[in-house]
Structures are given as C-alpha cells and as structure tokens.
C-alpha cells in the first residue's frame, strides 16, 4: 500500500515519530505494519527467504507509529487538528497518502532543510497545467528568496481556471509551525462545507511568513483510478523484482493495441 512509501519517505527524512490519521474501515493500514509471527514462520518453513525478508522490513522500519481516528470526513483541516496533542508545540510535517514523490532528496527532507534556514512554515508546490488548477489549492507567489523558495501573497482553494493566481499548485507535503492549530480551532467550514487546511494556512500567512517550495521531482497521484494504475506501472518498471517481466509484458501488449 502507498502508506508504506509515505512512512519510508518520513524515515529517510529523519522523522522518527509518525501519527497516522485514519478513518472508518481503515484498520488495514494498522494491520499492514503489525508483525505477523504465523506468516513469518510459514515463510521460513517453506524457504521463501525473499518474502520473509520483505515482511520483516515492513514491520521493522525503525520508526514509532501511532494512530488516531477521524470519525467523520470533515476536511483536511479537521484531520490535521486531531494531531494537536501529538505535535505538542513542535513544528511538524503533513504527508498526504494520495501523493507519492520521487527525487534524489526526499521532498519532506527538502522542506525540513528550508525550515532550518527560515524557521517558517513551508508548503510544497508544483507547476501544473493551467487547465488543471481547479483541482488544487493554488498560491499567489510574491517574489522568491531562493531559486525554489517563494514568498506567498495568498492561498486559494480550488480556484476557477480563469481566476487562478498562478499555476503553482499545493501538493501533499507541508511543514507547519504549531500556531496553525489555534487557527484551525476557530476555522469556519469552507469549500464543500469542510474545514480546509488551505484556508487556515492563508489566515496564518497574514500574521507570519509562509513560504512555498517548488518541487522539481516526480509526483504520482494515487487518489484516482487512472493515477493509481499509472503509479503502479511506474514503480513496477523501477523495482528490480518486477521491472524485466513488466517491460516484456508492456512490449507484448503494445504490439496488440
């Protein structure tokens, strides 16, 4: 599952304590990271060393995993607010499970590096086709302080194409200071009747700096069927255990189309 890649990115970025906010019928996420002694014994007995190693790596990531529930889907802002006691007054990172990122340096680590220099909240953005801006929160940039780091005039949640302030869309990585929780506590429902994180960040930007980091790596959106299939193929083509067979299959399939 994609949550595996999210946790691995967090670990590679130096994060040790991870809170996963789940919803109804999401127990499979918790089960995924639980140890399974019976399965491991069976794999060992049947000589499936490769699968045994993979199973053990999943459950022994070297990070501390915690879980909390969002009983009702009330928006991303509501989900983030449920992490308030866990964050305990520290800067923190939000990683959305629908977005997988690939780059030489993990995107989360890039945001942490920015924070080390600015000590300010930083949002990951990426240039998208203008016709697609209405799918995202979008920033209005206000000059840059580094090649990939912009000041932000304001944030707009899913603007109409003709009213979008830029083509720089917010993607699923945020580094925020804990002041965001005071804002979320009083945030009124926005688009769709939900508590929008983008609205809260826009409010925070009026009293303290919020920067936007332009991501130049690869982003995979697994939040829809087409994106999930494309991501599976892309990852399959780079994984040593599947790439050769998958390339062969795609070539054979291409000849039939």
Which functions belong to the PLM regions below?
Residues 20, 94, 123-124, 212:
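Structural beta-sheet core signal
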Residues 101-182, 187, 191:
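Conserved core of the sugar-phosphate nucleotidyltransferase
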Residues 12, 34, 85-88, 113-120, ...:
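Generic secondary-structure signature for well-ordered alpha-helical cores
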Residues 91, 141, 146-151, 165-257:
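Conserved alpha/beta core of the MobA/IspD/sugar-nucleotide pyrophosphorylase nucleotidyltransferase superfamily
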């Amino acid at each position: 599952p994609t949550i595996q890649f999210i946790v691995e990115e967090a670990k590679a970025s130096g994060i040790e304590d991870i809170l996963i906010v789940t919803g109804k019928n999401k127990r499979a996420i918790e089960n995924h990271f639980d140890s399974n002694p019976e399965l491991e014994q069976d794999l060992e007995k049947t000589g499936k060393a490769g699968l045994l190693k993979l199973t053990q790596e999943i459950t022994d990531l070297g990070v501390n995993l915690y879980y909390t529930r969002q009983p009702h889907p009330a928006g991303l802002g509501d989900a983030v607010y449920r992490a308030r006691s866990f964050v305990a007054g520290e800067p923190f990172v939000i990683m959305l499970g629908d977005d997988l990122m690939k780059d030489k340096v993990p995107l989360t680590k890039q945001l942490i590096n920015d924070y080390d220099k600015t000590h300010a909240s930083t949002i990951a953005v990426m240039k998208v086709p203008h016709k697609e801006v209405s799918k995202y929160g979008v920033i209005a940039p206000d000059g840059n302080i580094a090649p990939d780091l912009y000041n932000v005039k304001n944030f707009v949640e899913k603007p109409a194409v003709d009213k979008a302030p830029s083509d720089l869309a917010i993607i699923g990585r945020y580094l925020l200071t804990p002041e965001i929780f005071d804002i979320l506590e009083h945030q009124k429902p926005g688009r769709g009747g939900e508590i929008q994180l983008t609205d809260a960040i826009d409010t925070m930007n009026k009293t303290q700096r919020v920067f936007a980091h332009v991501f130049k790596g690869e982003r995979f959106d697994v939040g829809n069927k087409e994106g999930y299939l494309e991501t599976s193929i892309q990852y399959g083509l780079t994984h040593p255990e599947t790439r050769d067979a998958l390339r062969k299959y795609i070539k054979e399939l291409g000849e039939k189309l």
